[in-house]
């Protein structure tokens, strides 16, 4: 006996209601992208590893621990796409720089990270992604939050919104020094990961999931206290407009996001229906990515949402009313004609089925799940007729073949 081969750890097969939910999420996102004048973009699943090392930051968990990278047969360092923003920016530099800004790009598809599998988190997962590239005015940030909120509302998910600002580059450098001075006092209480972050990027300690570091992080300096007047004014303007639009949110001074390219506004949507891992959607502003890839420096903003986590907390979908026509032939001649009828009905857009190689009794048993059954006997066929049975009521009628299609359409309406 051959050894059973299961799916790869951290992946899963999608079917049934889970797949239906994914298709619904994708359709809602696409409809919103059309309303907000986005261009849909599909980037390759494989990219040069350097693209993500250069743009996500060497201190990010994605680059340090999670990226699936390998050398191809030509010796190039290639990776499976771990996130969308860097890939979308690469596509912008190659294909969209000549277009009037902001360039609005929408993507949906699979991503890959070598993470510890847990509820709502897989090594192959899917995201919906929106990017506004060349979005200078702060109102584009407001639009991003409004779109994100609309997206979650339309798929029936409750959410809470947290915002913060990372300010300009000068702000972040001053703030990093303040964090280093603060966390140095607690070095003996920091995890190995946080000690490494203390050397490379202390902001990432604020994103620590280690319960033993929670109280230390709570007492850390606040980045808004290090903002320039202009950066603080812009953040306050964004908050004022969100209040004007009756969008509830809270300012979270420890929110930093997990990737190093963010600057300015950052935001995260969480769900009260999830546990400790409650983030549903996140994003923020960035300005260095395009320049890092040989393009011009452009202020941009974007967000992404993990589909698997959304699927887990979406409301149960209403049952689909699949209206199916079953065909049950009786006799060898009827069997051949029933096959012709089966493919004819399908070509006319009806959902039709016929079980091959079964007895009449077994076929009728299978047909109980259908809306309508067409019973085709040899004697009836010789008269140019079939029996049509409505399965819910058991009502039967004899229908001439030339009227069969129109009768079935009426019964399936």
UniProtKB/Swiss-Prot annotation:
Domain of life per record: Bacteria
GO MF terms held by the record: ATP binding; histidine-tRNA ligase activity
A biological-process GO annotation: histidyl-tRNA aminoacylation
UniProt xrefs under PROSITE patterns: AA_TRNA_LIGASE_II
Protein name: Histidine--tRNA ligase
Predominant localisation class: cytoplasm
Family, similarity comment: Belongs to the class-II aminoacyl-tRNA synthetase family.
Catalyzed chemical reaction(s): tRNA(His) + L-histidine + ATP = L-histidyl-tRNA(His) + AMP + diphosphate + H(+)
Keywords from the named record: Aminoacyl-tRNA synthetase, ATP-binding, Cytoplasm, Ligase, Nucleotide-binding, Protein biosynthesis
Cellular component, GO, one term: cytoplasm
Self-association state and partner proteins as the record states: Homodimer.
Location within or outside the cell: Cytoplasm
UniProt organism field: Neorickettsia sennetsu (strain ATCC VR-367 / Miyayama) (Ehrlichia sennetsu)
E.C. code: 6.1.1.21
């Amino acid at each position: 006996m051959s050894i059973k081969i299961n799916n790869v750890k951290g992946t899963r097969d999608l079917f049934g209601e889970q797949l239906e939910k994914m298709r619904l999420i994708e359709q809602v996102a696409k409809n919103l992208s059309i309303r907000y004048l986005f261009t849909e973009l599909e980037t390759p699943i494989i990219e040069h590893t350097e693209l993500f090392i250069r743009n996500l930051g060497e201190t990010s968990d994605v680059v340090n621990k999670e990226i699936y990278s390998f050398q191809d047969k030509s010796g190039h360092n290639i990776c499976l796409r771990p996130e969308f923003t860097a890939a979308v920016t690469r596509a912008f530099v190659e294909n969209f720089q000549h277009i009037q800004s902001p360039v609005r790009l929408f993507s949906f598809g699979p991503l890959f990270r070598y993470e510890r599998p847990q509820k709502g988190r897989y090594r192959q997962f899917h995201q919906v992604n929106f990017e506004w590239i060349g979005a200078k005015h702060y109102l584009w940030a407001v639009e991003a939050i409004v779109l994100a909120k609309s997206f979650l509302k339309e798929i029936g998910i409750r959410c809470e919104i947290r915002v913060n600002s990372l300010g300009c580059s000068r702000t972040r450098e001053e703030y990093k020094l303040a964090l280093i001075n603060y966390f140095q006092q607690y070095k003996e209480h920091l995890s190995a990961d946080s000690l490494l972050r203390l050397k490379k990027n202390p902001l990432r300690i604020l994103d620590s999931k280690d319960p033993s570091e929670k109280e230390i992080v709570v007492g850390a300096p606040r980045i808004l206290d290090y903002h320039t007047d202009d950066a603080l004014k812009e953040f306050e303007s964004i908050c004022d407009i969100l209040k004007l639009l009756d969008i509830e949110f809270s300012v979270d001074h420890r929110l930093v996001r997990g990737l190093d390219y963010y600057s300015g506004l950052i935001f995260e949507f969480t769900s009260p229906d999830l546990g400790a891992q409650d983030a549903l959607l996140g994003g923020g502003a960035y300005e260095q990515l395009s320049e890092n890839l040989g393009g011009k420096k452009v202020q941009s903003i974007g967000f992404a949402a993990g589909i698997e986590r959304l699927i887990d907390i979406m409301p149960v979908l209403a049952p689909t009313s699949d209206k199916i026509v079953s065909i049950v032939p009786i006799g060898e001649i009827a069997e051949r004609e029933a096959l012709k009828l089966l493919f004819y009905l399908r070509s006319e857009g009806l959902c039709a089925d016929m079980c091959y190689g079964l007895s009449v009794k077994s076929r009728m048993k299978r047909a109980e799940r259908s809306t309508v059954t067409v019973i085709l006997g040899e004697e009836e066929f010789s008269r140019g007729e079939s029996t049509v049975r409505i399965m819910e009521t058991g009502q039967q009628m004899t229908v001439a073949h030339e009227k069969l299609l129109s009768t079935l359409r009426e019964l399936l309406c």
